[in-house]
UniProtKB/Swiss-Prot annotation:
GO cellular component, one term: plasma membrane
Quaternary structure note: The complex is composed of two ATP-binding proteins (MetN), two transmembrane proteins (MetI) and a solute-binding protein (MetQ).
One Pfam family recorded for the sequence: ABC_tran
Subcellular location: Cell membrane
Keywords of this entry: Amino-acid transport, ATP-binding, Cell membrane, Membrane, Nucleotide-binding, Translocase, Transport
Keyword Translocase: yes
Domain ABC transporter: 2-241
Gene: metN2
Protein name, UniProt field: Methionine import ATP-binding protein MetN 2
Amino acid sequence: MISFNNVSKVYETGGQSVHAVEDVTLSVEKGEIFGIIGFSGAGKSTLLRLVNMLERPTAGTISIDDKEITSLSTKELRKLRQRIGMIFQSFNLFNSRTVFGNIAYPLKLAKVPKNEIKERVNELLKFVGLEDKANNYPEQLSGGQKQRVGIARALATSPDILICDEATSALDPETTTEILNLLKKVNREYNLTILLITHEMHVVKEICHRVAVMEKGKVIEEGKLFDVFTQPKTKTTQNFVRSVINDHLPESVLAKIQNGGQIYRLTFTGEETGQPVLSYIAKNYNVDVNVLYGNIIELQNVLFGNLLVELQGEQREIQKALQHLRLQVQLKEVEAHAS
């Protein structure tokens, strides 16, 4: 659907070259929700602006449906942009227009007949749950309602691609969940390809099928959501994952661990998360088990469990217990931690 091939964007500032995007190669499949995460200045927003040619790449090519877009004429570019909807962190609504007027705006630009505009806007108002707000103005709406208007407006021209630029960053947690559920509904019912950028890993966890991590203009890690979450390779990705799975033990906890105790990280996937493995080894081996941290999250309908445990006992018994864990519980990873 969307392909970036060795794409770079360089700005000349004060006689210096700034690489906002550097040699990025990515593919976004049709109908998926693809997340791009990174800290401020990572190059996320610049990469998005390249998709609809608000910025042109300094090097490399960008293709949509196998058609290279960097050389499109003005007329062709106008048609392309009608296929791409966009929602923003700051909503970008017209304060002087009603909710109906904001949603209708791109249809008027496309010279859609008035009766079709009315039908389409009413359809979208129902879809985003704002049927009773058609005649309200943006100042009369909550942040979540404003973003719903933004989503409806982005869908007005029946695009193939929806770009989300930090779409939930200005919202409270409850409203964020509501908007993410709406975006999942958009993806499911319209089979829309969604390209989303954020600096919040919990947003990626809730909605994305695949994710790329950007740092200093480069993609440093990319893959399926489950793989990136459960096996983060880079330090930056590990830090993002810890914002959702904060398994860092406080010094006060480490200080209480008895001499001779050993800490292990256990990770479980799927049905493994429901197995009583710790009670089994406590009963069948001469080992004391102290759970220091544990959680279970769901990633694309697959459970992922994460435990940090302290094992106390003779080294021989601990090794027997670990061997059982590895063989019987399909232990994904056991990692010793220094206390």
